[in-house]
Every structure is written in structure tokens, then in C-alpha cells.
Amino acid sequence: MNLFADFENRIKTALETLDLVKEKRSELSFDRIVVEPPRDASHGDAATNAAMVLAKPLGVSPRVLADLIGEKLKEDADIAEVSVAGPGFLNIRLSVAYWQRLLANVIAGGTDFGRSQTGAGRKVNVEYVSANPTGPMHVGHCRGAVVGDALANLLAFAGYGVTKEYYINDAGSQIDVLARSVFLRYREALGEAVGEIPAGLYPGDYLIPVGEALAQEYGVRLHNMPEEQWMEIVKDRAIDAMMVMIREDLAALNVHHDLFYSERQLHANGAAAIRTAINDLTFKGHVYRGTLPPPKGQLPEDWEDREQTLFRSTEVGDDIDRPLIKSDGSYTYFAADVAYFKDKYDRGFDRMIYVLGADHGGYVKRLEAVAKAVSEGKAKLTVLLCQLVKLYRDGEPVKMSKRSGDFVTLRDVVEEVGRDSVRFMMLYRKSSEPLDFDFAKVTEQSKDNPVFYVQYAHARCMSIFRQAREAFGDIDLSPDVLEAAVTGITEPSEVQLIAKLAEYPRIIEASAQSMEPHRIAFYLYDLASSFHAHWNKGKDQPELRFVNDKNRQSSLARLGLVHAVASVLQSGLAITGTDAPQEMR
């Protein structure tokens, strides 16, 4: 049950009964009417702009219209009070009986409360991480991995048919460098003194086992092959080994993709997929032969002062036209991007989300141009950019040199502070804003550590259930029993907690629509704060305690509230990819 959608419908129904609305109904649009929590909770439980939106087309003042709407709403038994504020906003306070029914609805829904059908099963492809398969995941990949994964979880909960995809960049020049780096480690494993790793190769020790495995399997045979022969063998083995490492790193972060798509598929069979994509754009009039003027600043690697085959991307929103085929007949990296988008579109995705690092900001317009051209405007592409993560320890910048290279790996961070801390904190700021990650703060057991505070709220719920079983022994805490007891909830602070629970469906829909999974983390912290605050009131006010061993029925009512809080916490934590613990250790 979405409280705000429910009362938006009730307000629209009330409007339909007003004579002045009936007279001009064909001229009116209710689309801009919004019902939301008031900025100040003391003003009521819901607020609407209905009178402000419709006053001008109806030719009356907002306050007059608000009074008319308010009189109609007062006929609703679920509304305890209606008041007009400011220039014509309506504040609504709901009856205790309504809150009791809503609580019963949360209990019945369990962890499915808030699940939405907004997506209506529409297919969405979320591509994230897509790190080059040249080494272990570093902390720079971490934020995009978490944001992409949580966004995919959120969209699935909102009713979309989501595919989590990883694009393996295994066809570029970096793979040649990887193969040569591994071949050096292979020679080293055969006993050759290779000395210092040459500049331009990957120096990390993580390549040593790959070289050793090749030496064990092939002996000196690879060494005796011409480069064009051993290169393909080493490429295959190196990519496979790197992807095993990357999958393990992602699994440590509880990130699991549905599909790993190899760029080499696009280059197979004489690059048939790329050729087909370019032919398709040519047929649609988006391709021409020409020479690009030199761009200002540093020249991109695909620019050359010769005639090339170009994508007319400026006609579909890009800043410059983009090369597809170089003067020597080879395809550009961008040509593969076009083919990859077309492949997704041909797989039935008309909604695609790319989660990229902030350093890929220059790709946004060209990808959007590809989407418009390939799909003829039928597909929607969204690029989310994740800003940098800076590591600190007790406020001091972290500088760490690891055996895997001169960077902090994702695994380093997860092993030090735990998967849940990493995931939740990566979401505890909007992805477009830089994030400071302090190792000391994310392991504190205090209100200042959001992941601890939220998980502690769930663990506290579980502790209350254990306390109830100790107090009453055979007490039945099944949802049916707890639903039936909700009429015992009457205290204002209890109603405030239900009101916070009632926001969850709206948060889900709004977060999915704006593609902002961080809003789930913020909401969970607010809910945990409300729950902890209510629990603390029980210290001084025994009548508010969740378990009263002298009153089984009132305890059941409050245990229903605990069940509802635990369910929503568990649901939200699942979206963030974080555990809901039974107890804190």
C-alpha cells in the first residue's frame, strides 16, 4: 500500500465531486497534483498542492479551493483533520484506525511490502563494472560495482525485468600488453632471469601464477613458437585467469552479474557484428566519408588527418562526428561501442543504463547519440557517473602499496572492514558526489556509522522477538496473529514509526524513477533512527516497551510493529546488498 498514491486518488475523487471542477473538467489536468510527507511532521501526515495547481484554471483563489477540497476530504473516515496552510496547501492528518490498517498491511506484506509494479516487467539492461581484464579489481572500481548492483536490485524490486551485465574489454591493445606481461612471467617460471619488468608491461605479482600455469602445461613449447602463435594462446589463458580473479573479487563484494559479454564476440567472423552495425547506420543516413578537423587540446587516438568513415553523431546530439573506420580500414574502439549497443537493442532492451567512472564523462554524449541513431529514438539510454572515492584512516589519507601493484585493491578494503560496510558506505552519498571512505569510521559501533546503526536496528528487532519468547514461552508471532493485534497500537510515537514505514513504497518508486539507490540507504538510516528513538523512550515510559510480560495482548500489538520494522529493514538492506543480521557481533 502506497499511502501517498492512495490519498492522491482520494483527493482526485473529491475534486471530481466539486461543481466548479465538473464545469471545466475537460480543460483540467490532474497530472501535477502531488501528495507527499509535509516538510514539518507536526503539520500532519500528508500534504498536497492540489489547490495550488488547479486554482488558476478554475478562476478561484488557492485558499478558497483548498477549503472546498478540505470539506470533501473531511467526509472520509480515514481522515482525522484537514487544514489549509500558507497560500493554499492542504495538510492532512490521518486517523489512528487508518494507521492500524496500514501496519497490518506492512505485516502481511513482509519483505515484499513496498514492492512495486511501476516497471510493469519492462526489460532493463544495467551494465556496470566492465573493468579491463588486466588485473584485480581496485578500489576505484568498487563504487561503480556497488551503485550498479544496488540500482539493478532496486529496479527489480520496482517491477522491471533486469539483466545485470558486464562487458569484457578483451579485444583492445591492453590485451596485447597483458599477454606480453604474462609471457614474461612464463619465461620467468621456466627459470629465465627476466630482471626488472620493462616499462609498459603490467608489473603485478598477480600474473606470476598465470605464467607458472603456462610453464607447467606447455614447458618450453610456447617459447619456441613464433609470437603470432603464442600470443593467441597466452591471450586466452590470461583473460580467463583475470576474469576468474575479477569474478572472485566481485563475489567478495556480493556482486553477481547475469551475463558477461565478451567484446571479442563483436570481432568474431571478420567483425561481422561491427560491420552489420555500421551498415545499419549507413542505411539510416548516419554515416559518411570525410576528414575531421583536429580537435582542440590533446588529440584523441582515433583522430587522423585523412579521410575516414565517420558517424554523423552531431545530428543526434554529440559535439563532434566520430570515426568508425580508420583510413587503413580498421575499426575504431567506438565502432565496437556502436555494435555492442545494437546487440543489446536487438536482444530486446529499449532501456539501458551504463554505470561508469567519472573519468568517462566524455563518453556520455556519444553513447546517447548512438542510442538515438541505432534505435531511431525508441530506446532510452542513461549514463550514471560515479565520482572518485578517497580513502582515509582516522582522517589521514591512505597511501598503500600492495604486491598486486601500486593501488589499493577492492579485496584489500573488503577484507579489512567487511563487505557490508563497503557496500553500504559506497551508497551513503549520491554517486555524482565525491566520497570519503574512512577505515576507522566505518568500523565504529556508533550512530555515526550508518551501516552499524541500520544493522543494529534489525538485530535489535530480532533480540526483542527472543525476549518475547522468553517472557511468554509459547507465544505465536506469525504474521496472521500479529495483524489481528494491531488495534492495540494507539500511542503517538508508535504512529510516528508507522508513518516512517509508510514512506517506503514511495521511496522505492521515486528512487527507481530517479535511478538513485543512495536514497534507500538514507531512508534505512532514518527508519533505524526512528526505531532506536522509540525503543529508548521505553526506558523511561514502561507503557511504550515492546514486551510487557504482564500484558500479552499489548505486547503482541507492539511486536507487530517490530515485525514491520524488521521486514522493511531487511527489504531495504537486500536492495543495498547488505546483510540483515540476527545479532551484532
From Swiss-Prot:
The lineage of its organism: Bacteria, Pseudomonadati, Pseudomonadota, Alphaproteobacteria, Hyphomicrobiales. PANTHER family: ARGININE--TRNA LIGASE, CYTOPLASMIC, ARGINYL-TRNA SYNTHETASE. It catalyses: tRNA(Arg) + L-arginine + ATP = L-arginyl-tRNA(Arg) + AMP + diphosphate. Its EC number is 6.1.1.19. The gene is argS. PROSITE patterns: AA_TRNA_LIGASE_I. It is found in: Cytoplasm. A motif ('HIGH' region) lies at residues 131-141. Belongs to the class-I aminoacyl-tRNA synthetase family. GO terms for biological process: arginyl-tRNA aminoacylation. Monomer. Keywords: Aminoacyl-tRNA synthetase, ATP-binding, Cytoplasm, Ligase, Nucleotide-binding, Protein biosynthesis. It is an enzyme of class 6 (ligase). The keyword Thylakoid does not apply. This is Arginine--tRNA ligase.
